[in-house]
């Protein structure tokens, strides 16, 4: 990998590539004091967050799907092989031998709601309680939120927007539209997988 990027001189400074299920060591006494884990606790190669979510969701075959609603909206599935595609899916080796994970996602999930909270409810510690109450009420479903404040993999210059916003709309309508827009984006990613 270092040769591919033209930085062969750092090859001896990188950690070895291991499988996620390989035991690579144990928690030392000093590490246990620093992090609170018991000395001797095994340490494995591990996963990054989205793959860990898929594993903990029980995803182990192509007809199952993991949906992560974090900062990003991400759908993950598992296949027996990497499938060529013009679309830039993210592929990787899964923890089950002979399996690969495939991700489809974009920054169109909770990052949008967090932006709204920071802009319009910065001092309201109970804003999420209000939101839950508001979305349970009837709201104007013709107000559409495009959750692309932080980008999209649909197009490089696709902006976020509130489409159909009018003077009669309230913050309740806007919150409901944001929630619907986030769910819409999740469905787009799931459909692509």
Describe the role of every protein-language-model region.
Residues 1-8, 22-193:
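Active-site core segments that coordinate phosphate-bearing ligands/cofactors
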Residues 11-21:
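Short beta-strand-loop/turn "lid" adjacent to the catalytic site in phosphate-handling enzymes
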């Amino acid at each position: 990998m270092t040769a591919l990027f033209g930085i062969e001189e750092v090859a001896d400074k990188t950690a070895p590539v291991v499988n996620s299920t390989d035991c690579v060591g144990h928690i030392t006494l000093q590490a246990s004091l620093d992090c609170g884990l018991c000395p001797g606790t095994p340490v494995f190669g591990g996963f990054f967050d989205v793959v860990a979510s898929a594993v903990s969701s029980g995803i182990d075959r192509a007809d199952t799907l993991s949906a992560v609603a974090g900062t990003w909206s991400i759908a993950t599935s598992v296949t027996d092989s990497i499938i060529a595609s013009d679309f830039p899916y993210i592929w990787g080796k899964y923890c089950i031998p002979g399996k690969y994970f495939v991700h489809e996602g974009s920054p169109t999930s909770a990052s949008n709601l967090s932006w709204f909270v920071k802009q319009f409810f910065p001092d309201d510690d109970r804003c999420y309680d209000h939101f839950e109450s508001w979305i349970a009420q009837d709201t104007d479903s013709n107000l559409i939120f495009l959750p692309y404040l932080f980008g999209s993999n649909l197009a490089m210059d696709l902006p976020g927007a509130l489409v159909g916003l009018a003077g009669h709309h309230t913050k309740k309508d806007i919150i409901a539209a944001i929630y619907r827009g986030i769910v819409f984006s999740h469905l787009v990613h799931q459909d692509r997988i």
